[in-house]
Amino acid sequence: MRAPGHAAIRWLFWMPLVCSVAMEQLQRDPTLDYHWDLWKKTHEKEYKDKNEEEVRRLIWEKNLKFIMIHNLEYSMGMHTYQVGMNDMGDMTNEEILCRMGALRIPRQSPKTVTFRSYSNRTLPDTVDWREKGCVTEVKYQGSCGACWAFSAVGALEGQLKLKTGKLISLSAQNLVDCSNEEKYGNKGCGGGYMTEAFQYIIDNGGIEADASYPYKATDEKCHYNSKNRAATCSRYIQLPFGDEDALKEAVATKGPVSVGIDASHSSFFFYKSGVYDDPSCTGNVNHGVLVVGYGTLDGKDYWLVKNSWGLNFGDQGYIRMARNNKNHCGIASYCSYPEI
């Protein structure tokens, strides 16, 4: 049997989306016409035909309603964070996660804990590696499940700065294209895992900079050039499963740390400010991000997390996630960092 073409695949994806939206909301709100047009212009949205725009409009209205209700509840003290509309407003949760969250935990994830903790060590109350120049600018992964690659290079960028004094954006595309061999288990835009990316860099003898191997948001043939090597990795360190104290110590004493989180909720997609604490967030991680610090805001402990969804996400690309809250969203479950 011949495999379905792109048109058939698009149809199979599109029809359930249309039906789902139609069942929930049959008619758009004409009082929002101006704001819809303004939002489209702001985020440069274009649709192939009126039918697609109608469906996207209904999804946008549903998300807008969620945002308005949440912020009303926030004003009444029911939440510790605010949400706001962004460029993902015309997408369903399933679409966003399918395109942008593709963390693939190895079936037999190593259980060996290599992080050495010093329980008597005094740690600072607040850490922000951005202030020490160890964090590059926020990236945008686009419609490619390369979250794991951006998380991995982010951790290595911090180590490179601490080791050499140079802050260099490393190539996520290098990992997308070249660490997809069977022995690593990564699938490029189809997902991957940070420690497998670190292992590739170790085996390969290095990784290029983004300047010489730029991000394309698609799977391409590996064309790594050792002459352009920008960083190396000697080994990687894994933290104890679910141990927030160990994560705090690692972030405070070692640098930015790669982690996995559950990022499957509207509250996460549209986060804007405050400390993200959603009771529906689970320990089933599906998205790779980078912890670059921690602190306390209005009496609530948080992890400072760098995402790879561009500056329109969250607080200029960052989110503060609840800390010391029963491993909220699984943030301390799969943590690692590289060493040079």
Curated annotation (Swiss-Prot):
<dbReference type="InterPro" id="IPR000668">
    <property type="entry name" value="Peptidase_C1A_C"/>
</dbReference>
<feature type="disulfide bond">
    <location>
        <begin position="144"/>
        <end position="189"/>
    </location>
</feature>
<feature type="disulfide bond">
    <location>
        <begin position="281"/>
        <end position="329"/>
    </location>
</feature>
<dbReference type="Pfam" id="PF00112">
    <property type="entry name" value="Peptidase_C1"/>
</dbReference>
<dbReference type="GO" id="GO:0050729">
    <property type="term" value="P:positive regulation of inflammatory response"/>
</dbReference>
<dbReference type="GO" id="GO:0034769">
    <property type="term" value="P:basement membrane disassembly"/>
</dbReference>
<keyword id="KW-0964">Secreted</keyword>
<dbReference type="InterPro" id="IPR025660">
    <property type="entry name" value="Pept_his_AS"/>
</dbReference>
<feature type="propeptide" description="Activation peptide">
    <location>
        <begin position="18"/>
        <end position="122"/>
    </location>
</feature>
<dbReference type="GO" id="GO:0045335">
    <property type="term" value="C:phagocytic vesicle"/>
</dbReference>
<keyword id="KW-0378">Hydrolase</keyword>
<dbReference type="GO" id="GO:0019886">
    <property type="term" value="P:antigen processing and presentation of exogenous peptide antigen via MHC class II"/>
</dbReference>
<feature type="disulfide bond">
    <location>
        <begin position="178"/>
        <end position="222"/>
    </location>
</feature>
<keyword id="KW-0645">Protease</keyword>
<comment type="similarity">
    <text>Belongs to the peptidase C1 family.</text>
</comment>
<dbReference type="GO" id="GO:0005764">
    <property type="term" value="C:lysosome"/>
</dbReference>
<keyword id="KW-0865">Zymogen</keyword>
<dbReference type="GO" id="GO:0004197">
    <property type="term" value="F:cysteine-type endopeptidase activity"/>
</dbReference>
<dbReference type="GO" id="GO:0016020">
    <property type="term" value="C:membrane"/>
</dbReference>
<dbReference type="GO" id="GO:0031905">
    <property type="term" value="C:early endosome lumen"/>
</dbReference>
<dbReference type="InterPro" id="IPR013201">
    <property type="entry name" value="Prot_inhib_I29"/>
</dbReference>
<keyword id="KW-0732">Signal</keyword>
<dbReference type="Pfam" id="PF08246">
    <property type="entry name" value="Inhibitor_I29"/>
</dbReference>
<feature type="active site">
    <location>
        <position position="307"/>
    </location>
</feature>
<comment type="function">
    <text>Thiol protease. Key protease responsible for the removal of the invariant chain from MHC class II molecules and MHC class II antigen presentation. The bond-specificity of this proteinase is in part similar to the specificities of cathepsin L.</text>
</comment>
<dbReference type="InterPro" id="IPR038765">
    <property type="entry name" value="Papain-like_cys_pep_sf"/>
</dbReference>
<feature type="active site">
    <location>
        <position position="147"/>
    </location>
</feature>
<feature type="disulfide bond">
    <location>
        <begin position="134"/>
        <end position="233"/>
    </location>
</feature>
<dbReference type="InterPro" id="IPR013128">
    <property type="entry name" value="Peptidase_C1A"/>
</dbReference>
<dbReference type="InterPro" id="IPR025661">
    <property type="entry name" value="Pept_asp_AS"/>
</dbReference>
<keyword id="KW-0788">Thiol protease</keyword>
<dbReference type="GO" id="GO:2001259">
    <property type="term" value="P:positive regulation of cation channel activity"/>
</dbReference>
<dbReference type="InterPro" id="IPR039417">
    <property type="entry name" value="Peptidase_C1A_papain-like"/>
</dbReference>
<keyword id="KW-0325">Glycoprotein</keyword>
<protein>
    <recommendedName>
        <fullName>Cathepsin S</fullName>
        <ecNumber>3.4.22.27</ecNumber>
    </recommendedName>
</protein>
<feature type="glycosylation site" description="N-linked (GlcNAc...) asparagine">
    <location>
        <position position="120"/>
    </location>
</feature>
<dbReference type="GO" id="GO:0005615">
    <property type="term" value="C:extracellular space"/>
</dbReference>
<dbReference type="GO" id="GO:0006508">
    <property type="term" value="P:proteolysis"/>
</dbReference>
<keyword id="KW-1015">Disulfide bond</keyword>
<feature type="active site">
    <location>
        <position position="287"/>
    </location>
</feature>
<keyword id="KW-0458">Lysosome</keyword>
<keyword id="KW-0968">Cytoplasmic vesicle</keyword>
